[in-house]
């Protein structure tokens, strides 16, 4: 019986470690965050949205999308800001990574700002990344229903935006059904081992 107890304890420890292992494939809560549809579908566009579009390949100072992606957004409203926003459902109290890639050339006047639930997390005036893609990352807390948005203006030319994402911080993932299946299979297999041991 002592052998049976030890085997049960060991198997449960292994199975539970599998069940509660962090999910390394974080899901993006945004729709069309990489502008992969070639449009702004999934996004809400508002205010001055003149000269703002989704493009592919080389465009003005930019050689293409971030990381080789096909499409990216170019932002060029004149005189006043345009706004690009999206709402999503998440888990209240959980931590989320809000990230995006941005490129600009220091046009004057120009401005770019990013918001989480209406609170600015980034505000830039005449930003200049040398037309190179630069990643910005922020950690925020979910409320159950949240939103992100960008305000932007570039009178002379364009700024660029790509690969926008909101993902849950790893280590908080609720066990998936497949993990519960692994647990059940492990326990059932243990039962067979114990029975064979006890017959000897």
Listing of model-derived features with the role each one plays in the protein:
Residues 35, 82-107, 138, 148, ...:
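Extra-cytoplasmic beta-strand recognition segments
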Residues 107-116:
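Beta-strand acidic-aromatic groove motif in beta-rich domains, primarily in extracellular
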Residues 20-26:
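Sec/Tat signal peptide C-region and signal peptidase I cleavage site
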Residues 150-157:
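Short beta-strand-plus-loop segments that form exposed binding edges in beta-rich domains
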Residues 118-145:
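Extracellular carbohydrate recognition and processing domains
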Residues 175-195:
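A short, hydrophobic C-terminal helix/tail in secreted or cell-surface proteins
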Residues 71-83, 126-129:
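Extracellular beta-rich ligand/substrate-recognition surface
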Residues 36-72:
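Extracellular glycan-recognition surfaces and repeat-rich motifs
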């Amino acid at each position: 019986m002592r052998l049976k107890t030890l085997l049960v304890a060991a198997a449960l420890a292994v199975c539970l470690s599998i069940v509660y292992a962090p999910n390394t494939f974080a899901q993006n809560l945004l729709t069309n965050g990489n502008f992969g549809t070639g449009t702004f579908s999934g996004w809400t566009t508002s205010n001055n949205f003149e000269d703002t579009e989704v493009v592919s390949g080389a465009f003005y100072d930019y050689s293409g999308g971030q990381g080789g992606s096909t499409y990216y957004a170019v932002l060029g409203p004149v005189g006043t800001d345009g706004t690009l926003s999206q709402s999503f459902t998440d888990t209240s109290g959980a931590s989320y990574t809000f990230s995006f890639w941005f490129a600009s050339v220091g046009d004057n006047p120009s401005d770019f700002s990013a918001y989480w639930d209406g609170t600015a997390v980034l505000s830039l005036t005449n930003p200049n990344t040398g037309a190179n893609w630069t990643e910005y990352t922020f950690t925020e807390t979910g409320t159950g229903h949240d939103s992100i948005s960008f305000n932007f203006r570039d009178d002379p030319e364009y700024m660029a935006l790509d690969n926008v994402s909101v993902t849950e911080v790893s280590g908080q993932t609720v066990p998936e059904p497949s993990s519960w299946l692994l647990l059940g299979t492990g326990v059932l297999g243990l039962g067979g081992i114990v029975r064979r041991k006890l017959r000897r």
